[in-house]
């Protein structure tokens, strides 16, 4: 029964049994303004203002140890996840970020790189990070244990948080919609209004989740140095 | 799951990493960072003359 419930997520856009669903990941690439022209258009200015706001925010988060250009990867990570999340809300477009394949692909290499760099180059610093500031001496062994575990599950939580948030919204909308044909006209209009409200919530969640992912990876990277 | 069968996870991993790199490239080339503008604008002396060769 569980596979049946989630089978609404099996997309049917397949040509010659070759599933082209994952091509929706590239949709965001078409929406980012291209840099062919000298004078910025309105879309250019809008996108640039978003990126610059994010850049200032991440630079603050990274603190004094951030090098020039260190916010760049997180800003582009935000844009990738934002477009994938948001495009998935439109009908017939596959939400690639709702699958662990994509989210783990993004989270695991990032976390692994931070950990390898930190542990190999700044071993002392990484060890001191295992004990937060101001813990009583009695609690230190337990804090080390807890911090180690929380460190290890970080890529998992990053990936699963994004995928689960995306799936939850879509699942709710689908379940509500599946009851539609068996209802009277009045209740169907209430259902539609509810679904539209949920769609607005989902668009907010899409933007927020992409922001959370980017901010958390910024924080994880700032802990290393 | 049917859409996971033809392409394996490794190729999907490579595709998504390349997509991330492509996104990074697009964002890098389309950002126009603001250089800090000076507060005092030095306006040099301009004589308005009629245009001639």
Swiss-Prot record, chain B:
Keywords in alphabetical order: ATP synthesis, CF(0), Hydrogen ion transport, Ion transport, Membrane, Mitochondrion, Transmembrane, Transmembrane helix, Transport
Localisation: Mitochondrion membrane
NAD keyword on record: no
Topological type in the membrane: Single-pass membrane protein
InterPro entries referenced in this protein's UniProt entry, alphabetically: ATP8_metazoa (IPR001421)
Transmembrane segments: 6-26
SUBUNIT field: F-type ATPases have 2 components, CF(1) - the catalytic core - and CF(0) - the membrane proton channel.
Function summary: Mitochondrial membrane ATP synthase (F(1)F(0) ATP synthase or Complex V) produces ATP from ADP in the presence of a proton gradient across the membrane which is generated by electron transport complexes of the respiratory chain. F-type ATPases consist of two structural domains, F(1) - containing the extramembraneous catalytic core and F(0) - containing the membrane proton channel, linked together by a central stalk and a peripheral stalk. During catalysis, ATP synthesis in the catalytic domain of F(1) is coupled via a rotary mechanism of the central stalk subunits to proton translocation.
Protein name, entry field: ATP synthase protein 8
Species lineage: Eukaryota, Metazoa, Ecdysozoa, Arthropoda, Hexapoda
Gene: mt:ATPase8
């Amino acid at each position: 029964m569980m596979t049946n419930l989630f089978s609404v997520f099996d997309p049917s856009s397949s040509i010659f049994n070759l599933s082209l669903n994952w091509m929706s990941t590239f949709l965001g690439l078409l929406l980012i303004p291209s840099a062919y022209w000298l004078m910025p258009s309105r879309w250019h200015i809008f996108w640039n203002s978003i990126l610059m706001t994010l850049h200032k925010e991440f630079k603050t988060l990274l603190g004094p140890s951030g090098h020039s250009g260190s916010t760049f990867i997180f800003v582009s990570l935000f844009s990738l996840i934002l477009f994938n999340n948001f495009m998935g809300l439109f009908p017939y477009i596959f939400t690639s970020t709702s699958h662990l394949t994509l989210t783990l692909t993004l989270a695991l290499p990032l976390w692994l790189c931070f950990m390898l760099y930190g542990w190999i180059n700044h071993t002392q610093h990484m060890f001191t990070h295992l004990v937060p500031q101001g813990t009583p001496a009695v609690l230190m062994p337990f804090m080390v244990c807890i911090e180690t575990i929380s460190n290890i599950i970080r890529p998992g939580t990053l990936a699963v948080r994004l995928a689960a948030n995306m799936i939850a919204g879509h699942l709710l909308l689908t379940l509500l919609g599946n009851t539609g044909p068996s209802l009277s006209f009045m209740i169907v209009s209430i259902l539609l209004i509810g679904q539209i409200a949920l769609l607005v919530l989902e668009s907010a969640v899409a933007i927020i989740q992409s922001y959370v992912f980017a901010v958390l990876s910024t924080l994880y990277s700032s802990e290393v140095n | 799951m049917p859409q996971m069968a033809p392409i394996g996870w490794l190729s999907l991993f490579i595709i998504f990493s390349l997509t991330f790199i492509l996104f990074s490239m697009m964002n890098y080339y389309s950002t126009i960072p603001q250089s800090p503008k000076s507060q005092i604008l030095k306006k040099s002396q301009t004589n308005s003359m009629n245009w001639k060769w």
